[in-house]
Amino acid sequence: MKFAKGHGTQNDFVLLPDLNAQYSLTARAVAALCDRRRGLGADGLLRVTTAGAALAAGVFDRLPEGVAEDDWFMDYRNADGSIAEMCGNGVRVFAHYLHAGGLEHRSEFVVGSLAGPRPVVLHEADDTTADVTVEMGKAVRCGTGTATVGGRRFSGLAVDVGNPHLACVDEELTDAGLASLDVASPVAFDSTQFPHGVNVEILTAPRDGAVAMRVHERGVGETRSCGTGTVAAAVAALDHQGARTGTLRVRIPGGEVCVTVTETDSYLRGPSVLLAHGELAEQWWAAQH
């Protein structure tokens, strides 16, 4: 089994090329592979396949709305093995992998996901690095909510970016205060509002066209970055300013991305790095099932 390792602003992934969607990705096996001590280690797994192959293999019962059978399909799994609808950083790395591996020669194409089609543009790309924009779809405001993070209670805006987020802007929070906050420990939220869990972003108020953010991802814990989370953060920060559209730079521990929000869409631009290629031991993989 061949694999690659990559990251988008230090949100890291194992990529498994499986064009016929033949591999058995049980939650147990994925969790073992993503474990940083007994596996390769990653925030998540990206199976590289097509929507038609995933459909034929029973990954889903019907094609996600707007996704064609011949579209590339990013089958994304969280580090705990659970299935996730979308991953903005993952799409950038996925698109970069296709281009670097010679599987895709266009600079603009569509990556399918459970959240629907995600058009991508590769502005620059080589075998190791890339600059990629992902059309993330409309970010939907879903009311307000609260979460307790690091022993502090935060109020935030619920945002659907193909997956659920609670983005909490704190006017009093400084960069130093954000850096010292315990985001790694389990967070508390309203499970009736978010029955399937939620990604929680804590961010500073926007200053000079930028915000700083940390994130606790459902099924993973704190990560160095979260693509859909940066979009949710930008929506919440703009809302905090009384705006519904605009462009913001979002600084995360793993780097910086640029998010543009319009009335009908959102766009995420940032880097991708492919750092390793290798082969999994078949015996080890079989033992994880």
From Swiss-Prot:
Pathway assigned in UniProt: Amino-acid biosynthesis; L-lysine biosynthesis via DAP pathway; DL-2,6-diaminopimelate from LL-2,6-diaminopimelate: step 1/1
GO terms of molecular function: diaminopimelate epimerase activity
Catalysed reaction equations from the record: (2S,6S)-2,6-diaminopimelate = meso-2,6-diaminopimelate
Listed InterPro entries: DAP_epimerase_AS (IPR018510), DAP_epimerase_DapF (IPR001653)
Active site: C87, C226
Marked site positions, Could be important to modulate the pK values of the two catalytic cysteine residues: H165, E217
Keyword set, alphabetical order: Amino-acid biosynthesis, Cytoplasm, Isomerase, Lysine biosynthesis
Cellular localization per UniProt: Cytoplasm
EC number: 5.1.1.7
Highest taxon of source: Bacteria
Primary location class: cytoplasm
Residue positions binding substrate: N11, N78, G88, N89, N163, N199, E217, R218, G227, T228
GO CC term, one of those recorded: cytosol
GO biological process, one term: lysine biosynthetic process via diaminopimelate
Keyword Amino-acid biosynthesis: yes
Subunit structure: Homodimer.
Known function: Catalyzes the stereoinversion of LL-2,6-diaminopimelate (L,L-DAP) to meso-diaminopimelate (meso-DAP), a precursor of L-lysine and an essential component of the bacterial peptidoglycan.
PANTHER family for the chain: DIAMINOPIMELATE EPIMERASE, DIAMINOPIMELATE EPIMERASE, CHLOROPLASTIC
Record family assignment: Belongs to the diaminopimelate epimerase family.
Stated name of the protein: Diaminopimelate epimerase
Gene designation per UniProt: dapF
